């Protein structure tokens, strides 16, 4: 089944990734072509409306959200997912440009010092937009759960790279006691030894 987007290529550099994204044939190029779907995206991640956006009319993304490229919306959803993890650093931002060779191909540049976080957020944003534009009859994506999953993935990868136990690092970062998780199941009930 075709989705809205096809990620053609991802280039990773030290502080950003650049994804070449095809808006699949037959899919809308502009948010104005399906304003209800665009509104569904907004309801999933309402903070995108207040993102600083210098490329279009106005100062905030809400000023152009109803009439911009779908890949521009994808950029803002991705940046918001990165921001919500709390792991993207002090500034995460993006930039979207149409390809010189094909009006359906866009370069989506995401500034973030963690390539796994940026790629994971891009993949998650793609899934969320597919839901909003193509599968709104299905249950809505769990944004909070997605953010938690991305956060745990990145924390685990960082811990592993430092030679630490990823499970302990994730539990500590989330304020959980790793020892609590071992041994007892939720359904275990103490038994009186009399």
Task: Name the predicted role of every residue range.
Residues 59-67, 114, 146-156:
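Noncatalytic linker/hinge segments flanking ATPase motor cores
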Residues 41-45, 129-134:
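Short, surface-exposed linear patches
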Residues 70, 143, 147, 166-169:
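Short amphipathic alpha-helical segments that mediate assembly, nucleic-acid/protein binding
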Residues 73-83, 121-132, 153-194:
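Scaffold signal of the M16-like zinc-metallopeptidase fold and its non-catalytic homologs
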Residues 53, 132-158:
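Acidic/histidine-enriched alpha-helical segments
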Residues 82-129:
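M16 family metallopeptidases and their MPP-like homologs
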Residues 1-86, 175, 185-194:
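His/Glu-rich zincin catalytic helix
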Residues 68-70, 92, 96, 100-105, ...:
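Generic hydrophobic/packing signal
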